[in-house]
Amino acid sequence: KPGYEYPIYRLPEELAPDLAWCLPTHSCPEEAFLQVIKPEDPYYSRAAIDLDGALKNRNLEMAWLGHPVETYDLMLEGSGILAFDDGTQQAALFAGLNGHSGQSMAGYLIRSGELPRSKASMKGIRRWWDSHPQKRRAFLNASSGYVFFRFGAEHPKGTAGCELTPWVSMAVDPRVLPLG
């Protein structure tokens, strides 16, 4: 549909974890997934997926968003609620990763001198993205991690396992900021 040209993808079958591996002592499917995709064996990079169309024509598209920065933000958050034109809503939940490392778009733009910290808001990042098409691949190569999603009936949950609250909850890396 015009205006919605940027897909989010479900987890490709070749990346699906072997859930038979899961035992009660492991959380699933994330830990099982980590057994499938190892850093030495990464899947397509973000640039290959977003710019080169590595997943096109595979019927993996779950939904189409209006701007590539919106897809990046959803991946950064790890899950979210999609609002469709017909008024329905659907949870897009974390399903897996491509095995590459990722980084904050704001952090990258600040460190590379592209944006001052004062302008590194989502609005500022979107403005930068729209006005620098020739620099997009450099960012996507620097942050090549990719998040795949699944539809779910449950409300999105954060790292601590609690339901997320709109405008209150935020994404954190427990290696940097302890939970709780």
Region locations from a protein language model:
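C-terminal soluble interaction/assembly domains
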Residues: 153-179
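Secretory/export targeting leaders with adjacent low-complexity proregions
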Residues: 1-152, 158-162
